[in-house]
Design a protein with these regions (language model features):
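Nucleic-acid substrate recognition interfaces
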Residues: 1-477
Length: 477
């Protein structure tokens, strides 16, 4: 599942777009019975690969023609409002009773193309040309020594087929039957395909509460799949005063899946804990060890890499679900993460591979999507020093002071650390409390109350103790 969010107006809420990828089981040899509005199925067979390939190549050639026409008429399009670009290009290439096309070759070459497919091709071609023009304009502004290779207009080698409202038949979706209009080399006709009953029931159920958008056909590892897209609108927390929020501060870790704490603006920590997903973590470690065994034996390990990737993905899914479960139980208004860009060289010795596989951005994206559906907001703070500094203000922590011996060697427990005052504490849990403190300190600064606190670099050295010992500033109340 992949989610794409688009912010709307306050009246309409936030638009959340979700994609579900469903595999096609087989192709149906069927004809539509208009009297009973059912399919007369005479047989089942493998998906016709040549049919899909011909349709994709046909549309790809149409995109190539449209991009050439748009490039030639780019100066003309600059005088047209952007909202009318699609209709303007349609008039340039398609002749009607009231319009004579400037490029009649399109109708001759693609005379059987449906109108909705033509509009899809025009939209894709406009996006390609517009991106090329913007990249080329940026390239020209650079100095000759910094330019590099000149941007080119590239047509993708593969074209994903998108089916709009007019050309998809989803009325039989509850029965697991979908209809797609495809090109067989001579004409466009309806072809029907079968998906699993469980997938069909799930899509039919979520389609009652969400708007179905245009599905897309894609081929992954030799199998055809349909990507169904849905849109829904959700109202988020409308309170603009963030000092009234109850937040869930999250520190995503490597030793543990995540550490969290629930906090309010007066510095009170209502709940805290560490998420340990032992089943998923053990599965991932086992797959990593299996991969090493394959590499040491000189065996082909392509399948093992896929196992590791899938185990890692399942770990991120379980982490996101656990965080959302805690947020729902605690009834928080906002979930606060660290801003993790992941740039720079990765250090860490034996943990280097785990850092490479750290799906921090994937977990944050999944939590963001699920939180928005529940009306919660998402915020991020500066990550520097959250784990390095103790939440009680005692200074930097020591992560090499907690260890035990195995086979005569020291084995450090990096989940625990020692504060300067001698206290042994969970390092990630301390970081989670610092993350929550930085969120509220930032809001205090925006409210004009930072004069109540010590003058330290706000984005790097702030810890929980900074505003706990000072109390709730009256200026911010």
């Amino acid at each position: 599942m992949k989610d794409d969010k688009k912010k709307g107006s306050k009246d309409n809420g936030m638009s959340i777009k979700t994609c579900y990828v469903i595999g096609i089981q087989c192709q149906l040899d069927a004809k539509e019975n208009k009297k009973t509005n059912t399919l007369d199925i005479s047989g089942r067979r493998k998906v016709d690969d040549s049919l899909m390939r011909q349709t994709a190549e046909y549309c790809r050639e149409a995109v190539r023609f449209c991009t050439s026409a748009i490039l030639s008429e780019w100066d003309f399009l600059q005088s047209v409002p952007k909202k009318l670009w699609r209709s303007a290009v349609d008039k340039l290439i398609h002749t009607t009773a009231g319009n004579k096309a400037r490029y009649p070759e399109f109708d001759k070459k693609f005379k059987t193309m449906p109108g909705y497919t033509r509009r899809m091709v025009i939209a894709d071609a406009l996006g390609m040309v517009r991106s090329y023009k913007e990249n080329h304009a940026k390239w020209e502004t650079l100095k000759p020594a910094e330019r590099g290779a000149e941007p080119t207009l590239g047509i993708p080698p593969r074209y994903e087929l998108t089916f709009y409202d007019q050309e998809r038949r989803m009325s039989r979706l509850s029965k697991g039957q979908i209809g797609l209009k495809l090109y067989d080399g001579k004409k466009w006709d309806w072809y029907y395909f079968q998906i699993s009953a469980s997938d069909a029931a799930y899509l039919a159920r979520i389609g009652k509460s969400r708007k179905m958008l245009s599905p897309t056909v894609q081929k992954i590892r030799g199998r055809y799949e349909v990507r169904f897209c849905f849109e829904e609108r959700k109202e988020l927390v409308q309170n603009d005063r963030k000092l009234d929020y109850k937040i869930l501060a999250v520190d995503l870790g490597i030793n543990a899946a995540a550490s969290w704490c629930v906090m309010t603006a007066d510095g009170t920590v209502h709940a805290k804990g560490v998420i340990h997903l032992t089943c998923e973590e053990d599965r991932l470690n086992r797959m990593i060890n299996r991969k090493r065994q394959y590499q040491q034996a000189g065996k082909k390990s392509s399948c093992v890499y896929r196992w590791v990737k899938e185990a890692n993905r399942q770990l991120s899914i379980a982490t996101a679900k656990a965080l959302i479960s805690i947020a729902s139980e605690q009834k928080v208004d906002c979930i606060v993460f660290e801003h993790l860009d992941g740039k720079g060289k990765i250090h860490g010795g034996r943990y280097r591979e785990r850092i490479h596989m750290w799906r921090k951005n994937d977990v944050q994206a999944r939590v963001t999507d699920m939180a928005h559906r529940l009306g919660m907001r998402i915020s991020r703070v500066c990550a520097w020093g959250t784990s390095k500094l103790a939440f009680d203000g005692s200074g930097q922590v020591d992560r090499h002071s907690v260890y035990h011996f195995e086979h005569g060697k020291k084995v450090y427990n990096y989940s625990l650390c020692r504060f300067q005052n001698g206290k042994i504490y969970n390092c990630d849990l301390s970081a989670a409390q610092n993350i929550g403190a930085r969120f509220f300190l930032r809001e205090y600064e925006r409210a004009g109350a930072m004069g109540m606190f010590p003058g330290t670099p706000q984005r790097t050295l702030n810890t929980l103790i900074m505003f706990v010992k000072n109390g709730l500033p009256e200026k911010a109340v």
